[in-house]
Regions:
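Long, hydrophobic alpha/beta structural blocks
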Residues: 29-351
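Acidic, metal-dependent phosphodiester-chemistry machinery of nucleic-acid enzymes
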Residues: 2-7, 41
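Leu/Val/Ala/Ile-rich N-terminal alpha-helices, chiefly Sec-type signal peptides and the beginnings
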Residues: 8-34
Length: 356
């Protein structure tokens, strides 16, 4: 899925637009036991409760595709994957009304999701009449397909912070009762994917709140797939490769020059509509040499890059250190302003001498 398709779905997650026929969930305690199952028609929820569930649904599709949101291939041909796909399709096709399938789904989550804390599994079901669009993105009246999907959110449940509060029954201020509060989702997923604005049963969209250390274990165990790195992980790994390869032989100027050249490549590919083209080892070597790094060291960086990323290579734009470039730009602007101030002061002194 691309960002535009995610936003198209999220636009529906508002009170006046939400059409979820049903929502269900179960609380899982610290001993991995199911408690307090819930299954209701979404529009029958109290207004405040509905608002909170919509917040969770929105959060489960938040962030950028390739970072917080990862496309997952769920069709690998293995028996485990076929069983998992069959279960997900069954849950979707039942419109969340088959308790046996729901319990099987919950059990699979509990089996594959590693958490020492209690959590709340939520499932939304929706059917979206996908409007046909013309080449200039104008909507037509007719709906060609109905996109049916489930959205799963796994939310940690934590004790509220201790503190003082007004105890109305006793008419005094004292220690308030600590409640177990449902947090924003740590992970979640959309199935089937909404690829090219249509149903793709061979793919899912996985959400991870933590992009630095996403829950790859759950993703791989649940979907029986190989997890890809987030853009944040790729960027940090690339930074580590560059730092370790340069070691003591580098300085800030060399690192800046490298990222400046890398950024030029990213912008060039964007202009050519090739921004998704992977950064090759040859690209890395060429950039290093253009940044003033000697050929031998550039070759070492390229080899370390290949060893670290294998076939899951990032794009140039994904690993550019924009923060470093921004800081350097601020520094250069400050230096330029200081020079201008000095020149203005010298100019003022010259005028004074001429007027004497």
């Amino acid at each position: 899925m691309v960002q535009k398709e995610v936003l198209e779905l999220k636009r529906r997650f508002k009170k006046d637009r939400a059409t979820f026929p049903r929502v269900c969930g179960v609380y899982v305690d610290a001993n991995k036991q199911k408690q307090a199952a819930m299954n209701k028609q979404f529009l029958n929820l109290d207004e405040e409760v509905m608002h909170k569930y919509l917040e969770i649904a929105n959060k489960t599709l938040s962030g950028k595709v390739g970072d917080a949101l990862l496309n997952v291939n769920v069709h690998g041909g293995s028996e485990d994957q076929e069983d998992m796909t069959k279960l997900l399709m069954g849950v979707k096709d039942s419109h969340l009304e088959d308790d046996g399938l729901l319990n099987a789904f919950y059990d699979r989550v509990i089996e594959t999701y590693d958490s020492a804390e209690p959590y709340y599994i939520i499932l939304f079901y929706d059917a979206y009449d996908v409007m046909t669009k013309t080449s200039d993105n104008e909507k037509l009246d007719e709906s060609e397909i109905v996109y049916e999907y489930i959205l799963c959110s796994i939310c940690p449940v934590k004790l509220s912070k201790p503190g003082l509060g007004y105890l109305e029954a006793e008419n005094k201020v004292g220690l308030r009762i600590r409640d177990w509060v449902v947090q924003t989702p740590a992970v979640g997923f959309l199935y089937p994917a909404f690829n090219e604005r249509s149903t793709d049963i061979n793919a899912a969209l996985f959400y991870s709140k933590n992009t630095k250390e996403p829950d790859h274990t759950f993703m791989e165990s649940f979907f029986r797939c190989t997890a890809e790195m987030t853009k944040t992980e790729k960027k940090e790994r690339f930074t580590s490769v560059l730092r370790n390869s340069l070691a003591e032989s580098s300085n800030d100027a060399v690192t800046y020059a490298f990222h400046e050249k890398l950024n030029e490549l990213a912008e060039e590919r964007m202009e050519q509509d090739k921004e998704e083209e992977p950064l090759t080892a040859e690209d890395v070597k060429e950039i290093a040499e253009e940044a003033g790094i000697d050929e031998e060291k550039a070759e070492q960086i390229a080899k370390a890059y290949t060893s670290s990323f294998g076939n899951d290579k990032p794009t140039a734009g994904a690993v550019v250190d924009s923060k470093l470039l921004g800081q350097q730009l601020i520094k250069e602007n400050a230096e330029l302003k200081a020079k201008i101030v000095d020149l203005m002061a010298e100019n003022a002194k010259l005028k004074e001498r001429l007027n004497e």
